[in-house]
A protein has these predicted regions:
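Beta-strand repeat architectures
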Residues: 1-11, 17-31, 39-111, 115-140, ...
Length: 173
């Protein structure tokens, strides 16, 4: 497992490989630029994980090559910031009890196309998913946003545009 626990900004240009996981734990910003093939989960507990390449699950990208299962991309208090060109990915994600943020600030829209259910880490309590960014294209979230034993609130901030296409059932709005 690789854990980044820094309060400043750092760029990791090398590819990460193996079966381990990656965790963004510090309040700083970590930018991953390597085409990584690690197959463990990516967890963002604090700060910002900035990437320019998101592929479908199972393919190498800045967040590894884990499957598209929601347990393999976890937002739990931190931000996944997309800074690349227009892209579609079938990756689902989970939101923990500390909430999480998707930031679409690339040169093109980011489209999360998987229509499965968003995952949850921690079964009770209120969690907030924040959608933000500066990209004014139609950034899309097709995943179903539910509650799963708690309430899931949804917040939109920033100048970017987000389109929700899932059959959402969350009660925390």
């Amino acid at each position: 497992s690789l854990v980044i626990n820094r309060s400043d900004a750092i760029t990791l240009a090398n590819a990460i490989s193996g079966s381990g996981s990656f965790t963004q734990a510090g309040a700083g910003t970590t930018t991953l630029t390597g085409s990584s093939s690690y197959t463990g989960s990516t967890t963002i507990n604090a700060g910002v994980l900035s990437v320019a390449v998101l592929t479908n699950g199972g393919s190498s990208s800045n967040v590894g090559a884990a499957t598209s299962d929601a347990a393999n991309l976890v937002l739990n208090g931190g931000t996944l910031k997309y800074t690349g060109a227009a892209v579609s990915t079938d990756r689902l994600f989970s939101v923990g009890t500390n909430g999480g943020t998707l930031d679409a600030s690339g040169t093109g829209a980011v489209n999360f196309t998987n229509t499965g259910s968003m995952g949850f880490n921690g079964q009770s309590g209120i969690r907030t998913l924040t959608l933000t960014g500066t990209n004014t294209g139609d950034n899309t979230l097709a995943a179903v946003i539910g509650d799963n034993g708690g309430a899931t609130a949804l917040t939109k901030s920033g100048t970017g545009t987000w389109v929700l296409t899932g059959n959402n059932s969350n009660s925390g709005i």
